[in-house]
Amino acid sequence: MSDENNKGVGTAVQGVGGPRDGRTAPGEQGTTLTTRQGHPVHDNQNSRTVGSRGPMTLENYQFIEKLSHFDRERIPERVVHARGVGAHGVFRATGKVGDEPVSKYTRAKLFQEDGKETPVFVRFSTVGHGTHSPETLRDPRGFAVKFYTEDGNWDLVGNNLKIFFIRDALKFPDLIHSQKPSPTTNIQSQERIFDFFAGSPEATHMITLLYSPWGIPASYRFMQGSGVNTYKWVNDQGEGVLVKYHWEPVQGVRNLTQMQADEVQATNFNHATQDLHDAIERGDFPQWDLFVQIMEDGEHPELDFDPLDDTKIWPREQFPWRHVGQMTLNRNPENVFAETEQAAFGTGVLVDGLDFSDDKMLQGRTFSYSDTQRYRVGPNYLQLPINAPKKHVATNQRDGQMAYRVDTFEGQDQRVNYEPSLLSGPKEAPRRAPEHTPRVEGNLVRAAIERPNPFGQAGMQYRNFADWERDELVSNLSGALAGVDKRIQDKMLEYFTAADADYGQRVREGIQAKEAEMKGQKQEAPVYGTEASSLY
């Protein structure tokens, strides 16, 4: 980092060195290997020992630094969305929402002008499995976008599917525990998964999507994205509307059947990462159009669902998709760890003109996402280049592990690390438009929403599938439920039947056929591989 970049950030890091620093010791080149202390390394092949066969010495600093850092290279992986791939790009606004001026609904600056460009970083991911798990597994896909706007960062953190399993974040730890491998075997268990779903009828819609071909996108380039939750837009008058965000790939949408996924996994379990990386390297830059759905703020009793329910889709015929811009990904990360893995997203990261709704899942995510970044990356994760906004930053937040700089402006009195102050320090920004002030009234309760309707849209989705998609859905669910506890089977069949009678009947028959097939097979444990010869 150059002196110029370090102006006003405190003497502790002014003039800090790095790989691109031109200052070298006598005899060094710009390519000379050094320790982290800047000492030239003259022998990186042999440890310092007493004679060529003797013991190593404790004062072998080069060895100790190298090995101790290696021991600490890994940070805790994300509890969800651990396997991911990232890319840089740009978002171009249209200045409109559909055919209307976007300013009618939001004052967010990144949307206001036709052709206005905002740099972005995107991270795609699987959800339930580990860092190096196959990308062909049946699992929702994460679709997180960090917009580096002139007003600071905006994170739009969503999934490929437009809905979620649950509508209250209180259930989120239990959901994820059920999806993760069993704590006794370290093997993912369909019985555990559906045991949770059997007590969560609101998950029926998401299950219907996940166990269809939409549960395995062919690759990230051919995948939709969605904000999932309900947000708000706020205009210059402080008026708010409810919004849903949708990403539509210009490349089209492609999914895998289970058989196709098995074939891909047999040859390449990094296929989605490789596909995105290679496409960008050859200049075939993937693009997504951003659409929003808009609804007046309110409870909307005329609908058979609550607009704040993230297990529901807003019907397009009532709430049409309106185009607001396009995103192009055009640059791969230089270092996966520094960028893709240390990238930290949060649903609470909004700019002026964008706001929260009372969506329970959104409010829970807003706490959890930023909290897990502080645990995973550290309290100063926002000072990392991939997470830092591309604009002025001045705070009174100080110290903490791995503090890289002090967030002071040039010329600030270093004694003043508080506000208000007459001496120095950052001052509050003037408000340029009225704040959105929705009125909320009611008793504090623990209660589900009044229009849960857990099966209506699941049935509509089942009937809307193409024949081959329905066949795939039934086959996948039958295979997953065959052999699990009959109480769980019965409850899930009750849900599928409530969604659509044909849906429930076909899954029931599929389970029976699968269990009959399993019963007819020998129950011997499989023996893998070919017997080996003796080694020399």
From Swiss-Prot:
Q: Biased composition, Polar residues: where in the chain?
A: 29-50
Q: What cofactor does this one take? A: heme
List, in alphabetical order, the GO biological process terms annotated in this UniProt record: hydrogen peroxide catabolic process; response to hydrogen peroxide
The catalytic residues are 81, 159
Q: Where is this region: Disordered?
A: 1-54, 419-439, 515-536
- State the Gene Ontology terms under molecular function: catalase activity; heme binding; metal ion binding
Highest taxon, organism lineage: Bacteria
Q: How does activity depend on temperature?
A: Optimum temperature is 30 degrees Celsius. Active over a temperature range from 20 to 70 degrees Celsius. Retains 100% of its initial activity following incubation at 40 degrees Celsius, and 82% of its activity following incubation at 50 degrees Celsius. The activity decreases significantly to 30% of the initial activity following incubation at 60 degrees Celsius.
State if tRNA-binding is listed as a keyword.
no
Query: Which UniProt keywords are listed?
Result: Cytoplasm, Heme, Hydrogen peroxide, Iron, Metal-binding, Oxidoreductase, Peroxidase
Q: What spans are recorded as compositionally biased (Basic and acidic residues)?
A: 428-439
Q: Which GO terms describe its cellular component?
A: cytoplasm
EC number(s) from the headed UniProt entry:
1.11.1.6
Per the record's keyword annotation, is Ribonucleoprotein included, yes or no?
Answer: no
Chain residues that bind heme: 369
What reaction(s) does this enzyme catalyze?
2 H2O2 = O2 + 2 H2O
**Family note:** Belongs to the catalase family.
Q: Which PANTHER family match?
A: CATALASE, CATALASE-2
Q: So what does this one do?
A: Decomposes hydrogen peroxide into water and oxygen; serves to protect cells from the toxic effects of hydrogen peroxide.
How this chain assembles, per its entry, is:
Homotetramer.
**Protein name as catalogued:** Catalase
Originating organism = Deinococcus radiodurans (strain ATCC 13939 / DSM 20539 / JCM 16871 / CCUG 27074 / LMG 4051 / NBRC 15346 / NCIMB 9279 / VKM B-1422 / R1)
